[in-house]
Design a protein with these regions (language model features):
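Bacterial N-terminal signal peptides
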Residues: 4-15
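Gly/Pro-enriched, hydrophobic low-complexity segments
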Residues: 98, 121-125, 129-206
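Beta-strand elements of well-folded, non-transmembrane domains
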Residues: 45, 62-64, 144, 158
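An acidic-aromatic
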Residues: 59-108, 174-175
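Amphipathic hydrophobic-ligand
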Residues: 52-58, 171-172
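Flexible, processing/modification-adjacent segments and terminal tails
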Residues: 22-47, 51-53, 81, 90-150, ...
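Boundary at the C-terminal end of the N-terminal hydrophobic targeting segment
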Residues: 17-21
Length: 207
């Protein structure tokens, strides 16, 4: 129901069911042919009535398999960095870093989906929603939910991922709009290497 409200708020109806094959082609290309991905983003959190609760912006890097970095450039600041083995969460305002084993820390989450993805048909129920304006929408619902989110929708313009919408268990919607997208260009390993700043508290469950 919440997604239905969001679609109504966004405007026109969806394209016919004949677009299903085209939708899978877009998804397969993104997960199988895109090895690196970089973009700037604006993230907006909406409540169940589609009222904006919070807006942040930042930069995103992905290098498959398993590496990603989200840097939030808000006044509070936060970085989420995964190097394939360790996940770092840095809260600038709290001056605190959390260090955890990546495999156990993030489970089945959008970050795992976007930075891996080859198993998406095995792990997710996929629905091709079709075109709305210039954006082609695809829904992925985890087959085994761990409670972190209920549904993720990916919006493509042409073959390029431009929008991510996430519905959590509290019926809040997180909408991420991507810009300045760059695919399949080398990303330095240093982007995914995190060194805690001097003086911050480090909480770790990794040897």
């Amino acid at each position: 129901m919440r997604w239905m409200l969001l679609w109504l708020a966004m405007g026109a109806g969806l394209s016919p069911a004949c677009a299903v094959a085209d939708g899978y082609e877009r998804l397969d290309r993104f997960f199988e042919k895109v090895t690196t991905f970089k973009a700037s983003f604006i993230q907006v959190v909406l409540d169940e009535n589609l009222l904006a609760l919070e807006e942040t912006s930042g930069l995103l890097w992905i290098a498959r398999p398993g590496r990603f970095r989200w840097d939030y450039e808000s006044v509070h600041g936060q970085s989420i960095v995964a190097d394939g083995e360790v996940l770092w969460l840095y809260d600038v305002e709290l001056e605190q870093v959390t260090r955890r084993a990546q495999e156990s820390a993030i489970g089945q989450t959008p970050a795992v989906l976007l930075s891996g993805g080859q198993q998406y048909r095995k792990d997710y129920n996929v629905t091709i929603l079709g075109r709305q304006g210039a954006v082609y929408w695809i829904s992925l619902v985890p087959k085994l939910s761990d409670g972190s989110f209920a549904e993720i929708q990916l919006g493509f313009e042409g073959e390029t991922l431009r929008l991510i919408q996430l519905l959590d268990e509290l019926n809040q919607i997180t909408r991420v709009t991507l810009a300045n997208v760059v695919e399949n260009e080398p990303i330095p390993d240093s982007v995914f290497r995190f060194i805690p700043p001097t003086g911050v508290d480090v909480i770790s469950d990794v040897e």
